[in-house]
Design a protein with these regions (language model features):
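Positively charged
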Residues: 1-168
Length: 168
């Protein structure tokens, strides 16, 4: 997706600012993000991935599930159990790395209407929420994986960039 910012863009390494207006503009942004996420076959998308420094994310775990927007999310609690899974990212296309994350999470946020929302999630949903909140804090999956996997991923990204430049 040409809208999604790629690895190396400074906005992806910056902490996003809180949302303070819950209006039609925000609701339009949520709808746009949901559409881009779906078009890219993603399960989550954070505003910084579109170059927007706002603490806003959308996610959907399962094709039949509704899209959920979390505005200004804050992790209240994570379970002690962690699990390693291979994660990918729309901002780092073609790369998947192992990331350890808590299996359970509780997050307090607001929805796009401004209503308070408490989300208790496990498994894939918990992982997606934590991944997207990382984006709001300027953290990427390459920051959460092993040094070896990070090196290999960066090498693969450089090779893809070189191939793209040669094709152009």
């Amino acid at each position: 997706m040409s809208f999604v910012r790629r690895y190396g863009d400074p906005v992806l390494k910056s902490k996003a600012t809180p949302v303070d207006r819950f209006d039609d503009t925000l609701r339009g942004q949520v709808a746009r993000m949901a559409g881009i996420m779906s078009d890219a076959f993603g399960v989550g998308l954070a505003a910084p991935q579109l170059g927007i420094s706002q603490r806003l994310l959308v996610y959907r775990v399962g094709q039949e599930a509704p899209v959920i927007a979390l505005v200004n999310p804050e992790v209240e609690w994570t379970g002690e159990d962690e699990e390693g899974w291979e994660e990918g990212c729309l901002s780092i296309p073609g790369v998947q790395v192992d990331v350890d994350r808590p299996v359970h999470v509780r997050v307090r946020a607001r929805d796009e209407q401004g209503d308070e929302r408490l989300v208790e999630a496990s498994g894939l949903e918990a992982r997606v929420i934590q991944h997207e909140i990382d984006h709001l804090d300027g953290v990427l999956i390459l920051d959460r994986t092993s040094k070896e996997q990070r090196k290999e991923a960066i090498r693969a990204l450089r090779e893809m960039e070189s191939a793209d430049e040669e094709a152009a």
